[in-house]
Amino acid sequence: MIDFEFEFQYAEAKLPSLRQIGGSIPAGRCVVLCGGSGCGKSTLLRCINGLIPQFYEGELKGFCRLNGQDTAGMHIGEIGELAASVFQDPRSQFFTVNSSNEVAFGLENLGLPQETIRQRVEEAFRVFHLERLKDRNVYELSSGERQLISILSAWAMDTDIFLLDEPTANLDFVATRQLKEILLALKRQGKTLLLSEHRLYYLADIADEFWVMADGEIKGEYTATEAKAFSAEQRQTISLRTLDLAEISVPEKEPLPKTAATALAVSDVRYTYGRKAGDTLS
C-alpha cells in the first residue's frame, strides 16, 4: 500500500514541481501516472522512493507511507527494501556485467546466505520463464532484455511495491509485449504497481486506475473502465492517450526527392560486437 502527500520544489527552480499532491494506492493495485513531459510524474516517483531529497535537492514537504511505514528519516536503502524502483534506462542501475550476478547483487548487500541467494536467483528466472537470460553479459542484451533483468533484480528482493518510471521509453513493440507479461505476473502475485507512462495501450488489461497529471497536480483519477470508455475527443481534453492499439496509426511518409544520383554508398564494411561469434554486419 502507498499513501503520500507532497509539495516539492527543486533547488534553483523558480516554480514548484509538485503542488499539494496526494493519493492512496491499496495493496495489489496498479496505478498509472500519465500526462505530458514535465508534469511531475518522475518527480512524484522520486519523492516516494527517496531519491528526493536524498539525491535530488530541493524543498520537500509532506509524508509517504509504504505498507504503513513512514519513510521520513529512512535511508534510501531502507526505502528500497519496501519499494523497488525500475528506471527508463536499466543500464543506469546495473552494478555488474553478468545478468545472474546482477539479480543477486541486492541480496548480497542484505548479507543473505549464499545458498539462499542462489535459490532466489534461480527462482527469479524460473518464475518469469526467462532462463534464456541467465549468465549473460548485460551489455550484449537488448534494451528490452535489460529492462527484464532490472525487474528480476527488484523481484528477487521480495518487495511488495514496484515503482516504474516510463519502463517502455526505450523499448520496441516486441519488448513492450514481453514487459506486459511480466507486469501481469507481478499483478497476479499481488504486487502493488505504480508506473509513469506515455505509452498506455499495453496497460489496458493491467491498470486499475489512470491518474492524469499536469502542472505538478493530479487533475483526474479514472478507473480503467472509465478510461476505456472515453471518446477520442474526451481523451484529448484531459490529455489521456488511447488504450486501444487499433486506434494508433502511423502516417505514411512521402518519398524524399532525389537530389543526387547517390546519397550514400558503402562497401566492404564488417563489424562484430565484442566477443560475439561471426559478423554482426557484413
List the predicted regions and their residue ranges.
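Hydrophobic anchor residue at the start of the ABC signature
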Residues: 151
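Conserved ABC ATPase "signature" region
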Residues: 115-133
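H-loop/switch region of ABC-family ATPase nucleotide-binding domains
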Residues: 197-198
